[in-house]
Swiss-Prot record:
Residues 560-632 are annotated as: C. InterPro entries: HATPase_C_sf (IPR036890), Heat_shock_protein_90_CS (IPR019805), HSP90_C (IPR037196), Hsp90_fam (IPR001404), Hsp90_N (IPR020575), Ribosomal_Su5_D2-typ_SF (IPR020568). It comes from Burkholderia lata (strain ATCC 17760 / DSM 23089 / LMG 22485 / NCIMB 9086 / R18194 / 383). CDD domains: HATPase_Hsp90-like (cd16927). This is Chaperone protein HtpG. GO terms for cellular component: cytoplasm. GO terms for molecular function: ATP binding; ATP hydrolysis activity; ATP-dependent protein folding chaperone; unfolded protein binding. It comes from the Bacteria.
């Protein structure tokens, strides 16, 4: 096929500009990314070779070779992995195929360390070569294609690239970086090896370089005609824990997670019995940018007998643990395992159960840590992934109790929005005569903290959990008790504080009788806005509040469903009034403005719980009229 020039996709031009001008101080990443790509190409060859052994072309020893040429000022990264066809070279090197390109650019922070990590996360690591090179040449042939169908791709990184057909006997890919002026310090075995050992020592594939020895006559290091392996070249998870340093675990995590930060914690063990497998699991220290995207792919890397099978094996983890990164290497699964087989396999079910238990154990160790460092790590974890973990109460009945112990909430015990109170903490502080765990849900911490529903609890010194995450209302349908204590909303039903409010009960009944005519007239005035109007003892400072009936949906949940575009069933709240409040005391059932006062008390209660008025203009008009009548 003739020489052809093509333009880069628009986003690639933007990306090249970023690489060249913004990431120079972190230039070592180019080798990390290109070695990682070569490793992926080897994994793909092994995977496709399971079905077609001819792809190995009588060369089964897969490796990566790195070299340099001082005279030509080039660095070469060569692999004999799967290689690329012409169409694949254009697709992989001329466009960013992955969706979310715009998100990539919005996530750039200007922090070179963080931005460098995003490059790998978005699968655009190839372009990092332009940090140190002003021209890149790629020669490649896909395994299984004839030598005449090899391709040369070349670009100076300025907006276009060329494609040529070439002859190439060896399968795989050779990338040649033509270095920019001032990059000659990279043309050294010692320098390249130090970068490889820093970033790529854990790569399971041997990384070869020409051996270098001191030449006494020349008085310098010279290259020999033999190769040496410059990395450990063994799968890290297959080694004994005692052989792996914390630094090596961290580097391995950063490689598989494309993350520049250290993990919070990890666990590494071999399981024997019904299923045999090795697991190496990590908990990240921050959530990925796309954690809540519908097409987010969580899951672990799956290997079978050390042969890479797939990324993102979602069947090995429940959804609520989708943030966990790592590797599972099974001795039992067939090498031709597919995603469909994974869904039906009993071995996979056993692995999933084991991985889930191990992941929860990791979190329990952090949550129960005595030292400050461990406590801080769990705070970091909860801030990043707490809402995701809450999903587990509905998804994983078998581990519901374990998950409940890991939950953290804000509460009235501390004047802060920090979610650091466990259910066990709450129970340990309960009053002797208290039988329930009380909570309030709201859109925000400030709204929850100032909810009128909390007034009687403050008066009696009873702690209330403040729940403000969007997932909380859903979660509560699966979390009905803890340690034998039922959870109760302070804004639902006829509040019963047990022995804590025996005195108020009698006073409430008497007050209710005294203003019974007013209560009945209020129900008439408000009509179908409310299910009921009644006297309450839960208020001490506010004149009124809205509560949901025992089996009804809360106002907060109704608002949340509407905001999500779902149909929320129309449910009428109960209006509760405080008979001791001055506004309620002055209500007269036969006064001309009685109806306005009733609507004002309802609207105030709705606003206090974070609700929206159906008719704000009428509320303002009514309020002004009542203020004027008082002034007169």
């Amino acid at each position: 096929m003739a020489h052809e020039t093509m333009s880069f996709q628009a986003e690639v031009k933007q990306l090249l500009h970023l690489m060249i001008h913004s990431l120079y101080s972190n230039k070592e990443i180019f080798l990390r990314e290109l070695v990682s790509n070569a490793s992926d190409a080897a994994d793909k060859l092994r995977f496709e070779g399971l079905a077609d052994n001819a792809l190995y072309e009588d060369d089964p020893n897969v490796r990566i070779r790195i070299g340099y040429d001082k005279a030509a000022r080039t660095i070469t990264i060569d692999d004999n992995g799967i290689g690329m066809s012409r169409d694949e070279a254009i697709a992989n090197l001329g466009t960013i195929a992955r969706s979310g390109t715009k998100e990539f650019f919005t996530k750039l922070s200007g922090d070179q360390q963080k931005d460098a990590a995003l490059i790998g996360q978005f699968g655009v690591g190839f372009y990092s070569g332009f940090i140190v090179a002003d021209k890149i040449t790629v020669e490649t042939r896909r395994a299984g294609l004839p030598a005449s169908e090899a391709v040369r791709w070349e670009s100076a990184g300025e907006g276009d690239f060329t494609i040529d057909a070439i002859e190439r006997a060896q399968r795989g890919t050779t990338i040649t970086l033509h270095l920019r002026e001032g990059e000659d310090e990279l043309l050294s075995s010692h320098r390249l090896q130090s970068i490889i050992q820093k970033y790529s020592d854990h790569i399971a594939l041997p990384i070869l370089m020409q051996k270098e020895e001191w030449d006494q006559e020349k008085g310098e290091m010279v290259l020999k005609d033999e190769d040496e392996t410059v990395n450990q070249a063994s799968a890290l998870w297959t080694r004994s824990k005692s052989e792996v340093s914390d630094e090596q675990y961290t580097q391995f995590y950063q490689h598989i997670a494309h993350d520049h930060q250290d993990p919070l914690t990890w666990t590494h063990n071999r399981v024997e019995g019904r299923s045999e497998y090795t697991q190496l699991l990590f908990v990240p220290s921050h959530a990925p940018f796309d954690m809540w995207n519908r097409d987010y792919r969580g899951g672990l890397k799956l290997y079978v007998k050390r042969v890479f099978i797939m990324d993102d094996a979602e069947q090995l983890l429940p959804q609520y643990l989708r943030f966990v990164k790592g590797v599972v290497d099974s001795a039992d699964l067939p090498l031709n395992v597919s995603r469909e087989i994974l869904q039906e396999s009993r071995d996979v079910k056993a692995i999933r159960e084991g991985v889930t238990k191990r992941a929860l154990s990791m979190l329990e160790e952090l949550a129960n840590a005595e030292e400050d460092a461990g406590k801080e790590k769990y705070k970091t974890f909860w801030g990043a992934f707490g809402q995701v973990l809450k999903e587990g109460l509905g998804e994983d009945h078998a581990n519901r109790e374990r998950i409940a112990k890991l939950l953290r909430f804000a509460s009235t015990h501390g004047d802060t929005d920090a979610q650091d109170v466990s259910l066990a903490d709450y129970v340990s502080r309960m009053k002797p005569e208290q039988s329930r765990i009380y909570y309030v849900t709201a859109d925000a911490w400030q709204a929850a903290k100032n909810s009128p529903h909390l007034e009687v609890f403050r008066k009696k010194g009873v702690e209330v959990l403040l729940l403000t995450d969007r997932v909380d209302e859903w979660m509560l349908s699966f979390l009905q008790e803890f340690d034998g204590k039922p959870l109760a909303s302070v804004a639902r039903g006829d509040l019963d504080l047990g022995e804590l409010n025996d005195e108020e009960k009698k006073a409430q009944e008497e007050a209710g009788e005294a203003i019974k005519p007013v209560v009945e007239k209020m129900k008439e005035a408000l009509g179908d806005k409310v299910k009921e109007v009644r006297v309450t003892f839960r208020l001490t400072d506010s004149p009124s509040c809205l509560v949901a009936d025992d089996n009804d949906m809360s106002g907060y949940l109704q608002r949340m469903l509407k905001a999500a575009g779902q149909n929320a069933p129309a449910m009428q709240p109960i209006l509760e009034i405080n008979p001791e409040h001055a506004l309620v005391k002055q209500l007269k059932a036969d006064s001309a403005d009685f109806g306005d006062w009733c609507h004002l008390l309802f609207d105030q209660a709705l606003l206090a719980e974070g609700g929206m008025l159906d008719d704000p203009a009428s509320f303002v008009k009514r309020t002004n009229a009542l203020l004027l009548s008082r002034a007169a």
